[in-house]
Design a protein with these regions (language model features):
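Phosphate/ribose-recognition catalytic cores of enzymes acting on nucleotide-derived substrates
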Residues: 2-158
């Protein structure tokens, strides 16, 4: 079951991309990692967009403690897997648009189960992209400045 934010809103997180432990890269799903300064974002996997270098990229986005590797002891992190993208964007500031929640966080028995689910999440994100106008959340881009790592609701365009 998928959940959308109440129309006409999406959540936008602005943050600097930090180097992580490279685990996503080693299992075939590299991510742009943004620290989350506070609670308020719903943990789970989302379909959305990442603004980077003046371009928009579809992304499967995870927010949570990364329970497969760290249990509840891991610090919260936003990890965005940009589809069809392989550039190094460490230390760049990006905007991450959380548009549709795909599922909650869960712990997997191991890496094979996790990678199978990540592949399904990417497929679900691609399916979502086919139903969304690429410019929909950006047609009336908000003129807001937010602290790094803080999410703000933004009105979606019609």
């Amino acid at each position: 079951m998928t959940e959308r934010l109440p129309e006409p809103h999406v959540l936008v997180v602005r943050g600097g991309v930090e180097r992580g432990d490279q685990r996503g890269r080693t299992i075939g799903f590299p991510t742009a990692n943004l620290p989350i300064e506070r609670d308020g974002l719903l943990d789970g996997v989302w379909a959305g967009w990442v603004d980077c270098r003046g371009r928009r990229h579809a992304a499967a986005i995870s927010i949570g403690h990364r329970p497969t590797f760290y249990g509840r002891e891991g610090f919260r992190l936003l990890e965005a897997h940009l589809l069809d993208f392989d550039d190094d964007i460490y230390d760049e500031v990006v905007d991450v648009w959380l548009c549709q929640r795909l599922r909650g966080q869960r712990r997997f028995a191991g890496v094979p189960e996790l990678t199978a689910q990540l592949a399904a999440d990417v497929a679900a994100t691609r399916a979502w992209v086919r139903t969304e106008r690429r410019d929909a959340p950006f047609a009336h881009r908000p003129l807001v400045t937010v602290p790094l790592g803080v999410a703000v609701p933004v009105a979606r365009s019609a």
